[in-house]
């Protein structure tokens, strides 16, 4: 059933609003994927905060017109599913993870930070850890010296409480004998 002009305007406005707040767009061909698999992909995308939609390419081009995503217009050919996200890597990660299990999903292009990405670029973007993962790694690195110091102080306190002899570190505090 063809869309009327009002429906097309609503779609362009909706996609345009998503693009306005997005950092990344990834395009993938979905030809031959069963509906239940696409439903799983949509649920996964929703969980990751990715706007995932099958669009007519002319409507997608019109929505991208005048935005940083306009360079993708040449890549908008064939039956495509569009992954749009404010998170720099979420859309690439969702589509790449799904493509690992579903051979018929073929990533064709992407755009991040105003730069057009080929298939290899999208795959590289998908391998970057998420912001939360990076923050937890940074926190682990920052807390490692503190926790190591706490373990050492705890061990010294336990030794003193048990009446064990002091470690070699106390000998260094003594003044050397004059010759």
From Swiss-Prot:
The keyword RNA-binding applies. InterPro entries: Ribosomal_uL10, Ribosomal_uL10-like_sf, Ribosomal_uL10_bac, Ribosomal_uL10_bac_type. GO terms for biological process: translation. GO terms for cellular component: ribonucleoprotein complex; ribosome. One of its GO terms (molecular function) is large ribosomal subunit rRNA binding. Keywords: Ribonucleoprotein, Ribosomal protein, RNA-binding, rRNA-binding. It comes from the Bacteria. This is Large ribosomal subunit protein uL10.
